[in-house]
Design a protein with these regions (language model features):
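Conserved AAA+ ATPase core "coupling" helix
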Residues: 153-154, 161-168
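Single conserved hydrophobic/aromatic residue that forms the stacking wall/gate
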Residues: 169-178
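Conserved alpha-helical scaffold flanking the Walker A/P-loop in AAA+ ATPase domains
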Residues: 79-88
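Ser/Thr-centric signal marking residues that sit
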Residues: 20, 129, 175-176
Length: 178
């Protein structure tokens, strides 16, 4: 669906539509294939939702899931986790959920952290999520992404559309290396 083997993906999500649930489903699939997942989240996962989505996994599979909350300090967590992330393989997955705050511009420290994580991850499958926001400019594009400052990532949108509960819309390919 997201073709994570083709490089890092930035998923811009309309609030409340299920971006974290989508990433948890991808996490379950990766863990079922006996690979590892490192999950970095700005806030704690909803335990009921996580339990429901990961319910089919056994203890051995769940032992390969590393979940860390970074709050407002992604850069410090990213720096501390660099040795672990350097050991991930192309079958593993790195999820950075809500990598930047949901209002305003992405802080310089968060951008620095994400660029470092992308570089450290190498060929590891990587997905970044952030909240999409409605464009105030009236330039014809209703939605904007907080990840527009990131190069080397594919931009994907998860938005509500008339007649559909949710829709994935592929927008762009990376134009430059990370």
């Amino acid at each position: 669906m997201l073709d994570l083997e083709s490089g890092p993906v930035h998923l811009s999500v309309e609030e409340g539509i299920g971006g974290t649930s989508l990433c948890l489903s991808l996490t379950a699939t990766v863990l079922q294939s006996n690979s590892r997942v490192v999950w970095l989240g700005r806030s704690p996962l909803n335990s009921e939702r996580a339990q429901a989505i990961l319910a089919e996994l056994n203890e051995t599979q769940l032992e390969r899931l590393f979940i860390l909350e970074f709050g407002n300090n992604l850069l410090a967590r990213a720096t501390a986790l660099k040795p672990l992330i350097n050991r991930l393989t192309d079958t593993d997955l790195l999820v950075i959920d809500d990598w930047c705050p949901s209002s305003g511009r992405a802080p310089a420290n968060d951008l620095q952290a994400v660029r470092g994580l992308i570089s450290s991850a190498g060929n590891t499958r990587l997905i970044l999520t952030s909240k999409a926001y409605e464009s105030p400019s009236g330039d014809g594009n209703k939605w904007k992404s907080r990840g527009s400052q990131l190069s080397g990532v594919r931009q994907v949108w998860l938005l509500r559309q008339e007649g559909f509960r949710l829709s994935l819309i592929h927008i762009s390919e990376p134009t430059r290396p990370y």
